[in-house]
């Protein structure tokens, strides 16, 4: 009798097979003497669509809503049906005695496996592999500590409740809004409050009125001492009066006080913090960062589990620090690593905190030594960010002295603060020295003459627009960006971790861009006209982050066995009735402000112009008609002058490529340039890209080489 291991992806399945020395490869699984490992392809089973409950639901009608199934159904995803049949046959195999779930260790990973097992009707015992990295050592250690599957039943119930609630609310709210206003509109418990967060910031900026204010400083022996102000001076004349009073007067040093301080590195990365830092440093979007992390985790085995919300490690990991450091010797930080390897580490260090680690600890390097030349540029950047933060947290704190000098001139007090570094500590990693040593020796009681008096003009600044990095952080802490009028709700949001999860926020932002509710211009995220109207037409409960925070709090209670999942689902059904009825009874109107005079070639209705991340397209205004046409899109063709990516306008022989520098090429000119560049041949990479993306061959720069390609 053998144990069947169910992994989430083929790559992880192969890693497990390698760690357990399983040699016999078959179609869809790998077998050994004791184990068989098979895999899903992400989800193999999903919630049924409305039309799979009743064919009449294929047509979207307001009268049919709400659609509330008595019992939720699941279906096998047609694209992955072949693999599902393989997994099913293995689960039901008489030679299989038990199932070991080895999907991602978290709520969604549990759902992937349990939906498959439930669909098959599994009755065999279940065990759980729970690991935070897929290195050979981690897998082998994990198999020595397999848990009983029953210990994760509550986790599954929470995942299932989340999935069913999102279906019930999302399907009905979206269909209600779309059919009521005859427009492609989408609602969701996370995406709609996210639009509201961006809208609130946008309003704050639009209504902001800058105000001038003034400060005064005196210069003593080359050092500026600032006037201690009880208020912000908006009238320059007030400071001019003070200037007149102290001019040519003698001052006195009242106090010279030094205070030693220390600062620690920023916490180890969780996913949101890493996505924010990657955007700040490299302008990498959250989705791009997550995908890169997945490669580092699954393919290269260089980092631990990415989808974590924790900034800490568990104290039992203290003995693994040295081997992780040895792995980083392969990087440019090797000199700092050598200094650390000789040290001993204690679980009393600030990075260890069992209470602040739930499913997974912070993202840190594994013990696998990186082959830098095998990493892509993005993978290298993200790995180095993680290694850098890991090392900073192991290094000594930054020690410095804050020297404060208080002075008096007439009836006015002045202050000078200087930071004097004592020990760079973790700052030595990047040599972050921005302060200087105070060379003048001020003494208490010392008299001085003022060399110069200056009045400085300042202006209040509006808050900045969100970018993809800062919006993630705002979703994690929405209570800081929306006026909730109740401290209780702010506490709920803080406790529940905001709206969405570390694993879903990047997808939500991407979806809002794709549905044209948000747009990003020069890194500034703004709400589109469509996004504003979605907020105006939506029931207020769905635009506030409070609701989704309350849901998340209940899901966390379900995970802990402290709340009934069926009660939660019934609450969601009641809520859905309320939302649908509000939409039905609304007398508001939706206005397409981007309607064009171009007729849809399919149904004849006028099309609307929408912005996408890579350009613009025309979409039929009728949500039942799926016709789309590209107006312009960014291509991979580079400008011969400035090397930037060119934008394609139009299609076919009439297409034109334009660059921001002003360079323009017709399709025939582009074809000739690419033929000359490639000698009429096309690379395997370009061929694969064409096959995967199904680009229009008329507007592919390599079309002459591709046109004879048989697919």
UniProtKB/Swiss-Prot annotation:
It comes from Staphylococcus epidermidis (strain ATCC 12228 / FDA PCI 1200). InterPro entries: Topo_IA (IPR000380), Topo_IA_2 (IPR003601), Topo_IA_AS (IPR023406), Topo_IA_cen (IPR013497), Topo_IA_cen_sub1 (IPR013824), Topo_IA_cen_sub2 (IPR013825), Topo_IA_cen_sub3 (IPR013826), Topo_IA_core_domain (IPR023405). It is an enzyme of class 5 (isomerase). Residues 186-191 are annotated as: Interaction with DNA. Releases the supercoiling and torsional tension of DNA, which is introduced during the DNA replication and transcription, by transiently cleaving and rejoining one strand of the DNA duplex. Introduces a single-strand break via transesterification at a target site in duplex DNA. The scissile phosphodiester is attacked by the catalytic tyrosine of the enzyme, resulting in the formation of a DNA-(5'-phosphotyrosyl)-enzyme intermediate and the expulsion of a 3'-OH DNA strand. The free DNA strand then undergoes passage around the unbroken strand, thus removing DNA supercoils. The active site is at residue 305. This is DNA topoisomerase 3. It catalyses: ATP-independent breakage of single-stranded DNA, followed by passage and rejoining.
């Amino acid at each position: 009798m053998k144990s069947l291991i169910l992994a989430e992806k083929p790559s992880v399945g192969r890693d497990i097979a390698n760690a357990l020395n399983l040699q016999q490869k078959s179609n869809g699984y790998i077998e050994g003497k004791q184990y068989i490992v098979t895999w899903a392809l992400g989800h193999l089973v999903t919630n049924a669509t409305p039309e799979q409950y009743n064919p009449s639901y294929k047509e979207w009608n307001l009268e049919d809503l709400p659609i509330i199934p008595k019992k939720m159904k699941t279906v096998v995803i047609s694209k992955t049906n072949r693999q599902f049949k393989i997994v099913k046959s293995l689960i039901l195999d008489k030679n299989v005695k038990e199932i070991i779930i080895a999907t991602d260790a978290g709520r969604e990973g549990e759902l992937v496996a349990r939906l498959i097992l439930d669909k098959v009707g599994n009755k065999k015992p279940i065990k759980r592999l729970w690991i935070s990295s897929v290195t050979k050592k981690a897998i082998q250690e994990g198999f020595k500590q397999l848990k009983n599957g029953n210990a994760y039943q509550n986790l599954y119930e929470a995942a299932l409740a989340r999935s069913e609630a999102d279906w019930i609310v999302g399907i009905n709210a979206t269909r209600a809004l779309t059919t009521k206003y005859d427009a492609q509109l989408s609602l969701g418990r996370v995406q709609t409050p996210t639009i509201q967060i961006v809208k609130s910031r946008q309003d704050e900026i639009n209504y902001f009125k800058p105000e001038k204010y003034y400060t005064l400083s005196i210069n003593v022996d080359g050092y500026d001492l600032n006037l201690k102000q009880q208020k912000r001076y908006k009238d320059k004349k007030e400071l001019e009066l003070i200037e007149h009073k102290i001019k040519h007067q003698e001052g006195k040093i009242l106090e010279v006080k030094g205070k030693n301080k220390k600062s620690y590195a920023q916490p180890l990365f969780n996913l949101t913090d890493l996505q924010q830092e990657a955007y700040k440093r490299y302008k990498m979007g959250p989705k791009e960062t997550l995908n890169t992390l997945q490669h580092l985790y699954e393919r290269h085995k260089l980092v631990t589990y990415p989808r974590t919300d924790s900034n800490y490690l568990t104290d039992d990991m203290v003995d693994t620090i040295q081997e992780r450091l040895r792995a980083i010797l392969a990087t440019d930080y090797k000199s700092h690593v050598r200094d650390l390897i000789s040290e001993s580490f204690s679980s009393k260090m600030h990075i260890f905190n069992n209470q602040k680690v739930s499913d997974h600890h912070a993202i840190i390097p594994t013990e696998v030594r990186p082959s830098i030349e095998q990493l892509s540029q993005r993978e290298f950047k993200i790995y180095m960010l993680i290694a850098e933060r890991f090392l900073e947290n192991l290094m000594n704190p930054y020690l410095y002295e804050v020297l404060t000098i208080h002075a008096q001139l007439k009836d006015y007090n002045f202050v000078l603060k200087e930071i004097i570094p004592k020990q760079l500590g973790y700052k030595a990693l990047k040599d972050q020295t921005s302060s200087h040593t105070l060379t003048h020796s001020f003494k208490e009681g010392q008299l001085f003459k003022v060399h110069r008096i200056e009045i400085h003009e300042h202006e209040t600044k509006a808050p900045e627009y969100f970018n993809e990095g800062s919006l993630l952080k705002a979703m994690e802490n929405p209570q800081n960006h929306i006026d909730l009028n109740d401290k209780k709700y702010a506490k709920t949001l803080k406790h529940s971790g905001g709206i969405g999860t570390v694993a879903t926020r990047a997808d939500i932002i991407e979806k809002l861009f794709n549905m044209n509710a948000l747009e990003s211009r020069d890194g500034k995220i703004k709400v589109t006209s469509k996004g504003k109207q979605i907020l105006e037409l939506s029931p207020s409960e769905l635009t506030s982050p409070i609701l989704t925070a309350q849901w998340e709090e209940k899901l966390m209670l379900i995970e802990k066995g402290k709340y009934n999942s069926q009660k939660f689902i019934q609450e969601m059904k009641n809520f859905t009735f309320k939302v649908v009825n509000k939409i039905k009874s609304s007398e508001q109107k939706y206005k397409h402000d981007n309607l064009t005079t171009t007729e849809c070639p399919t149904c004849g209705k006028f099309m609307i112009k929408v912005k996408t991340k890579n350009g613009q397209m025309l979409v039929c205004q009728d949500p039942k008609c799926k016709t789309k046409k590209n107006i312009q899109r960014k291509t991979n063709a580079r400008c011969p002058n400035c090397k930037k990516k060119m934008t394609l306008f139009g299609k076919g022989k009439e297409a034109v490529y334009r660059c921001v520098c002003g360079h323009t090429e017709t399709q025939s000119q582009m074809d000739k340039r690419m033929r000359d560049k490639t000698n009429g041949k096309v690379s395997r990479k370009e061929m694969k890209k064409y096959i995967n993306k199904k680009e229009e061959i008329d507007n592919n720069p390599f079309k002459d080489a591709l046109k004879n390609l048989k697919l």
